[in-house]
């Protein structure tokens, strides 16, 4: 029970720091074994997280499974655009594209916008879509990404972030005026 209490408490602190933004539990890869990952995800949900990246925990506890693809997904394709397009075709109802594998502002966000435009032009409803930032100056990158998305007519696209986040970093990013509205937390 100590492990789960610790995770639930930490999740609660992170949720409070996010001030209404959604927190997704991304802790499986850092868990001390599969059981710790499953029960840690459950504890994070008790602490206020809106979903988990842990598919088994989602099945066992009937909680929402949320997340995006990894950098390795993008690197397994000949180029970033093809990776994004393939992912969007597989998950048109929940399309979140990880835009910082190569160059966030010069290729990642522009390629995401290209895919979103193609989805819109094909008549695919854009309801739950956005981008994820996982490195760099998250406050700056989110502000610049928001400008690019808005200029392209995707002002309802969300910006999610991960990257060793905890309640203190989330508070700092919010104080800097970041444009992030959902957070993937698990390393810390």
Give the location of each predicted region:
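Buried, small/hydrophobic-residue-enriched core segments of structured protein domains
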Residues: 1-155, 165-169
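Glycine-rich phosphate-binding active-site loops on the catalytic face of alpha/beta enzymes
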Residues: 179-188
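Conserved acidic functional residues
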Residues: 163-164, 181
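Residue-level "edge-of-site" marker
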Residues: 71, 162, 186
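Hydrophobic/aromatic residues located in beta-strands of well-ordered beta-sheets
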Residues: 95-97, 159, 183
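Hydrophobic alpha-helical positions that pack around
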Residues: 173
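Conserved dinucleotide-binding and phosphotransfer motif residues
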Residues: 176
């Amino acid at each position: 029970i100590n492990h789960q209490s610790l995770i639930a408490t930490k999740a609660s602190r992170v949720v409070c720091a996010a001030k209404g933004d959604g927190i997704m539990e991304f802790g499986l890869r850092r868990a001390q074994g599969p059981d710790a990952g499953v029960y840690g995800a459950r504890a994070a949900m008790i602490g206020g997280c809106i979903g988990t990246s842990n598919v088994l925990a989602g099945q066992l506890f009937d909680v929402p499974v949320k997340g995006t693809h990894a950098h390795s997904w993008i690197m397994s394709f000949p180029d970033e655009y093809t990776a994004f397009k393939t992912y969007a075709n597989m998950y048109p109802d929940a399309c979140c594209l990880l835009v910082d594998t190569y160059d966030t502002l010069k290729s990642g966000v522009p390629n995401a916008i290209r895919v979103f435009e193609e989805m819109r032009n094909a008549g695919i409803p854009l309801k739950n879509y956005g981008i994820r930032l996982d490195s760099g100056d998250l406050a700056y990158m989110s502000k610049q990404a928001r400008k690019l998305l808005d200029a392209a007519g995707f002002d309802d696209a969300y910006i999610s972030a991960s990257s060793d986040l905890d309640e203190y970093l989330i508070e700092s990013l919010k104080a800097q005026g970041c444009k992030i509205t959902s957070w993937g937390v698990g390393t810390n």
